[in-house]
Amino acid sequence: MTKVRKAIIPAAGLGTRFLPATKALAKEMLPIVDKPTIQFIVEEALKSGIEEILIVTGKSKRSIEDHFDSNFELEYNLQAKGKIELLKLVDETTSINLHFIRQSHPRGLGDAVLQAKTFVGNEPFVVMLGDDLMDITNPNVKPLTKQLIDDYEETHAATIAVMRVPHEDVSNYGIIAPQAKAVKGLYSVDTFVEKPQPQDAPSDLAIIGRYLLTPEIFSILEKQEPGAGNEVQLTDAIDTLNKTQRVFAREFKGKRYDVGDKFGFMKTSLDYALKHPQVKDDLKAYIIQLGKALEKTKP
């Protein structure tokens, strides 16, 4: 059996929900406290045993490449001033086996994944979406990507991460129709539906941005017609793959952060700041102070 060694991180979206900040800055470089969101995704991949990562970028995304490249002037300056801990933080991002490819036009997630065909070759691989941050700080819980890899080692089949969402929110996600009850958190899947209306949704199990796929997906994506939003949808291709190979779904019950919209991004930033050793105490005191002030404004 071929080991899962490679991951794809699509990062070619326009980031329109965060304009004007993302006019010249990649959305994936917006910081959660002091770390770009994409770095959290890369760290999950490495913690899961991934050895090579391809980031699919678009226009105005050069900042992502710069972040993971060495910066001699900065490193020399930190070394000269004895700021060794900061130097270690900078070095962490430059020793990773990263590759980059540009998606010329944003034609959807399926097309972004298709750009990785040569990089992947004939190996199973992981797709990790940057809008979904999974908490990997609990030492007693495997990272979600590692869970998918472990599932593949048992089933030798593609496996998609899912999570239960409120029924009224299903139109924001790809949704699975499970064939039966889960066995140890793993569902066999009947069909995959991209962003159904609530009345048409086969379940409340939503795809949440971690996919372990087999290389057969590429021949399907090459023929895939545009779907929802007139984009090439990865969910549609996975549904086609499921007709010739078994595709499973792993239910995730850990902590997931959605940083794809402003409110989700702010909640994530607040949660991470409350764990950050340099700011957590002052932030807690400020939140308490702010809460008291808000109480006084109640009618």
From Swiss-Prot:
UniProt keyword annotation of Nucleotidyltransferase present: yes
Catalysed transformations (reactions): alpha-D-glucose 1-phosphate + UTP + H(+) = UDP-alpha-D-glucose + diphosphate
Disulfide bond positions: none
Gene3D superfamilies: Spore Coat Polysaccharide Biosynthesis Protein SpsA, Chain A (3.90.550.10)
Principal EC category: transferase
Pathway the protein contributes to: Carbohydrate metabolism; nucleotide-sugar metabolism
Pfam families: NTP_transferase
Domain of life of the native organism: Bacteria
Keywords assigned: Nucleotidyltransferase, Transferase
EC numbers on record: 2.7.7.9
Single GO molecular function: UTP:glucose-1-phosphate uridylyltransferase activity
Family under the similarity heading: Belongs to the UDPGP type 2 family.
Name of the protein this chain belongs to: UTP--glucose-1-phosphate uridylyltransferase 2
Gene, per the UniProt record: hasC2
